């Protein structure tokens, strides 16, 4: 780390600025220095001509040389006339160029900025400025000043300045006052600031520990936190206890605050199986809507295909298959009803049945939408059916509401999907909110087929939609159980079904050549073995290139977690070389050629395909490869399958290395070769569902490397964290009410 210094000067030029988060590269003219100082950091709304006092640390960029990374910035409006002209003509006010700026400063001198802000009617004396234009300039200048002040307020508390835009959209000029009155608004989902951070800010602003704002915000935060962990609601007593732990108060002290939230519709309280359940309003609405629509699909008659059995016989001949009884039953039910659940493990014929259903619908003259929760799952669905498939989000026309922090979709009841049937694969990954959006976008009379493996890990988001539907016994379902002879030849598939039964699969190397076990109980030996497999043994001995190998781990942390594995794999597979550009970000070095994963949804990133088509949005779990880093290290080009996106350097905070990923992150994907690094981890991760999901990610080759006692523990441990959801009960009760 370089020397910490303070420099004072005037902004000469803004080289780069990211409007979303304030990341800026600028040149600062410092008296007594021959060359301007390059300053980088979060400096919102910077403009040429303004004065700055910057405190920061010197570093040396490989291309641009010495630069000062700003830790704190004090800013001053320009005072000299030449600086005012530079400031006003820098682009901060749309339509004000050098000539207009010159006329303004010549007329009003040192009072120019004050006149623009407070006396816009005086601007009409300037050629080309009408009364309307004067008002627009004044409004824009005040908004800019307010935004900059808001960003500086956020920066003072080490909060990300990109929060300023949504805060200003919600609260306007009163955003700072709103934060002073109730800083706990920052803990809401759309802002995503950790509650403990907000709590520290509130204490510094004089808030007491029993302030009603604090208590209500903590209750809501706890519901949001548990929704992120899969719960649709929380029992009242659990909510009170968990929040009391967060705040270090007693549950009794929270009772009144919770009742006030319920009275104000900030929380919905309903009795579920004798338990007082507390819902976030949006999750209550989602759950009740999903239950109602599913029951409607179950009850509503659809046009039945005459002579369905004969049509199915023809499909068998056309596709060269002979359906097993349960497969035939699935295709028949798809022809006769409005909804079908099709479930089964690997090798049980889900894909064959799915192809039959698609062919059947096409023979019935039905337009079919093939959907999946992730891009990789959609790509695989398209490959196995020979038809176009897309993600649910893309089909529904996803957008993002910055005011609410929630995903929104263009397709809905008013503008539904223009298809007669919807087929969704990998249903175990679909949470209650996405299910609500999908059902809302289906027009009346449409059919729905949901395909999945209930033994895989449940959705990351709230609910257990597939499991609840199956356990309700209300939705027509076919569970394929027969493992076909060809599939039985695969040791991978045999291992998956063994684990599903709670058995550890035979760890002697299989005769089929697609599953191997390497016992490595010492963590350093396990990491070394994984590196050797990816770098040498699989590419050289089995012809599997490193880019087709995915390393999985149950955990991110620890000596054999994905963080440690990624460091070792990057060093082995993509080491630094002369001429290969790289960018340091935090404790990570991103290098051209690295495999990376997006770690949170970004709805604004633009991407383009080779055919020139484009769109926006790179989402949590998307995997790409760094193709280029510009000489300045500020622009990074990434390839996500068939999409190319350009990231600014600050967006590197949203990326992680993906040579190794957690099993949870691998859901919905399949890989030619999988290496599972099995080592000790948190008990909640060493469960059967994690091992089963890891095994079923492998298509051609699976290597179980690590501690056999850990594998045995995972296979035997079928404990699943209970998810609080009312969908199953709503389906059962609603069905029997009729």
Predicted regions located by residue number:
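Accessory, non-ATPase domains that flank or precede helicase/AAA+ motor cores in DNA-metabolism machines
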Residues: 1-310, 738
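A generic structural signal for residues embedded in beta-strands
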Residues: 14, 54, 598, 626-629, ...
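Short, well-ordered loop/turn sites that connect or cap secondary structure elements
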Residues: 46-48, 416, 442, 590, ...
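Loop/turn positions that initiate beta-strands
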Residues: 49-51, 593, 621
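Conserved pre-motif I regulatory segment
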Residues: 310-338
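ASCE P-loop NTPase helicase motor core
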Residues: 328-331, 336-512, 709
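Conserved helicase motor core of P-loop NTPases
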Residues: 454-616, 627
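C-terminal accessory regions
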Residues: 501, 613, 620-738
